Amino acid sequence: MIIEGLKLINFRNYEQLQLQLHPKLNIFVGENAQGKTNVLEAVYLSAIGKSFRTSKDQEMIFVDKHQAYVQVKVKRVVYENNIELRLNVDKKKNIKVNQVPLLKLGELLGNLNIVLFSPEDLKIIKEGPGERRKFIDGEISQIAPKYYYNLNQYNKILQQRNKLLKYHKGKKLDLEVWNEQLANIGASLIIYRRNFIKRIAILAKLMHRKITDGIETLEIEYKSSVLIKDHDTVDQIRVGFLKELNQSADEERRRGVTLVGPHRDDLNFNINGLEVKTYGSQGQQRTAVLSLKLAELELIKGEVGEYPVLLLDDVMSELDMKRQNDLIYHLKHVQTLVTTTMLEPLNIKNVQDKALFRVIKGEIGKYE
């Protein structure tokens, strides 16, 4: 799939922008705070329905304006999508796909698939379990919208259950109904996550072996907070989940919080048997994330039948020449949007299919 055109009105620092994109490599060059990342943010917003930089729609609206408009024209193998979003200062955003208003955010997912790679992605390795769960949830939701709905439902049930536990802290409390609901939805999430991690772990391992010339082996392991076996069915997981909720009931009442479930899941990243978070160098951590992102491209391709659009936000300059070469090699069949402050460090001399853009204060022109 490719993005043919992008239109922005009062989005971030763009009062008016109409841009035709190259079907392969698009490079946006400019100093900091000129609007390069804003272009990627608009594309991400069109795919996911929210920003990767802020949780507040108002921050994406041009100063002193009441509404921002984003339009992305997507060409897929067998059809086209026209995605439009209107962000409002004082009310919810409006989203249309092919002129049809969407009632729920989840209906947007899958109309445009993207993979984002930014310096912030090192958090997947370096920071806490919440960052890794966010990564899992975001990727599965793109290829399985049902997962997105189940996740929202699970979080609502979890929130209510935690309120009860907190309000009745230390007291006897009948949680049977809440336990059943949490286990039913939670088991479904665990199945999705287990299958996703199995697939992406295999792909990331292959990518990592290639990038490191076979010297390093990357292993990604799903750590479910509910005890599961490889071939457990959703019903077996549900039963096990319920059992663990019952076993932790006294401790949950004492602490006033739910201690078991997908909201406590994690991932382990190991290189040659050692945990990357603790023992990996900065270079190894970057390579692990690069391998993960390349694996995402292949996984989405296998799931939807075509490559997603790749967004690279100021990461090329952080990769050495070999890793740049490995990344560029995998971009031959992928439309890519790259931001950078300088063109010189990028190893793109031999790349013929590309468009270069200069970004200055919310204006985009050809790079001369």
UniProtKB/Swiss-Prot annotation:
SUPFAM superfamilies: P-loop containing nucleoside triphosphate hydrolases (SSF52540). One of its GO terms (biological process) is DNA synthesis involved in DNA repair. The keyword Hydrolase does not apply. Its main location: cytoplasm. GO terms for molecular function: ATP binding; single-stranded DNA binding. CDD domains: ABC_RecF. ATP binds at G30, E31, N32, A33, Q34, G35, K36, T37. Keywords: ATP-binding, Cytoplasm, DNA damage, DNA repair, DNA replication, DNA-binding, Nucleotide-binding, SOS response. The keyword Magnesium does not apply. One of its GO terms (cellular component) is cytoplasm. It is found in: Cytoplasm. The RecF protein is involved in DNA metabolism; it is required for DNA replication and normal SOS inducibility. RecF binds preferentially to single-stranded, linear DNA. It also seems to bind ATP. PANTHER family: DNA REPLICATION AND REPAIR PROTEIN RECF. NCBIfam families: recf. Belongs to the RecF family. This is DNA replication and repair protein RecF. The gene is recF.
